[in-house]
């Protein structure tokens, strides 16, 4: 059973007739039970329709009882020996009453199926929030060949979803005002949170049970776009120009934060002047622009001894021309990057020496920040082998002692 309340009935009617999907209806009803969103959308839609339909039947029965009548009593009140009246009643039941019932059901149950594309989430909580998409995400993660114990699932949504959600909210708000009910917009469940509630378990299952947590060194980011409705935000540049400032480093001034800020500033009247409520139905769903995997940096530390008098600590390039063939940094980095399968690195050391100065004694401490490593753990044996690779390859130049990261 869905955790719905009496005050949710008009919201459900309003949103279903406006083209919202079942999960978005739950969001606007402020349902925070995660299990409710994990149900198949068709089952949820069926329960929503049943909830509203049963409520209306209950109201009808209460009205009849208040008038001191029952369906059987109303039927018995009709004179038995009056065929014309009976015929009229049968005709009314067979035609007019049936039509009224169909119209009433149509208002609450606009479609047997969910809308092809939800007017609020643009399909993010429909086909893109299910087993098929979970398989797609998992396949991308497996293809990248990362090693990880846990993962964090993040979502990037198009900014126009904020505009559409606000439009649906105003649509519901009007209904609530007429019925003297109060609902706070801050209590609405966000699309991003709903997506995570549904997909975290599904993705984890596809990856063999790897825990999907709220904090992890390994992140899987899913980015959605919807070019068809990009223009939904454009009116805000006029309605609240101060919120949108040109930035060369950004592809668009209509960032999610800027749109949210603008919606908070403008009045309902200004919004409704430029944008319809409820929003217009789209013809296409959101598409997955990118599924990106990223592991936070890890650090490898150690000490090095340098015996060569012609080896700089870092690459020596002057006016675009390389002066030395190699450097301490490069000699250490090459095998380390290969072992950890990292995309890049940052090298730092405790001080530095001139090219013609040797580093003796216990060696100079150094650290390497490995960017987006696909491997994060090496055994002590593997670390020893890595040390030997550097030593054997460059025995005339450098000795390296690498500490295993704790």
Regions found by a protein language model. Give the residues of each.
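RNA pseudouridine synthases
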Residues: 1-406
């Amino acid at each position: 059973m869905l955790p719905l309340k009496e005050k949710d009935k008009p919201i459900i009617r309003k949103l279903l007739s406006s083209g919202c999907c079942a999960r978005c209806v739950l969001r606007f009803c402020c349902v925070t039970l995660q299990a409710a969103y994990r149900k198949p959308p068709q089952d949820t839609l069926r329960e929503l329709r049943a909830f509203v339909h049963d409520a209306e039947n209950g109201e009808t029965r209460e009205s009849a009882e208040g008038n001191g009548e029952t369906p059987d009593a109303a039927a018995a009140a009709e004179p038995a020996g009056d065929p014309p009246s009976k015929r009229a009643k049968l005709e009314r039941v067979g035609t007019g009453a049936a039509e009224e019932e169909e119209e009433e059901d149509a208002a609450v149950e606009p479609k047997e199926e969910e809308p092809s594309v939800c007017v609020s989430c643009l399909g993010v909580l429909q086909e893109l929030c299910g087993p098929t998409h979970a398989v797609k995400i998992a396949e991308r993660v497996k293809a990248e060949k990362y090693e990880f114990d846990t993962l964090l699932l993040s979502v990037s949504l198009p900014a126009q979803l904020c505009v559409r959600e606000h439009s649906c909210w105003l649509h519901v708000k009007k209904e609530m005002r007429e019925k003297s009910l109060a609902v706070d917009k801050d209590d609405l469940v966000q699309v991003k949170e709903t997506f995570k509630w549904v997909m975290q378990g599904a993705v984890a299952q596809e990856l063999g049970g790897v825990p999907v947590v709220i904090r992890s060194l390994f992140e899987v980011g899913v980015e959605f776009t919807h070019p068809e409705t990009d223009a939904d935000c454009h009116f805000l540049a006029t309605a609240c120009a101060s919120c949108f400032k040109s930035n060369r480093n950004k592809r668009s001034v209509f960032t999610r934060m800027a749109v949210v800020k603008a919606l908070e500033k403008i009045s309902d009247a200004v919004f409704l002047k430029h944008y319809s409520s409820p929003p217009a139905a789209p013809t296409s769903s959101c598409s997955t622009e990118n599924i990106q995997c990223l592991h936070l940096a890890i650090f490898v530390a150690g000490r090095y001894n340098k015996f060569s008098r012609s080896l700089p600590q870092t690459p020596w390039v002057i006016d675009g021309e390389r002066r030395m063939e190699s450097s301490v940094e490069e000699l250490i980095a090459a095998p380390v990057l290969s072992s950890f399968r990292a995309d890049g690195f940052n090298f730092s050391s405790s001080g530095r020496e001139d090219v013609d100065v040797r580093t003796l004694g216990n060696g100079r401490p150094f650290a390497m920040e490995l960017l987006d490593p696909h491997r994060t753990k090496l055994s002590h044996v593997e670390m020893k082998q890595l040390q030997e690779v550097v030593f054997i390859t460059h025995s005339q130049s450098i000795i390296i002692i690498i500490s295993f990261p704790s």
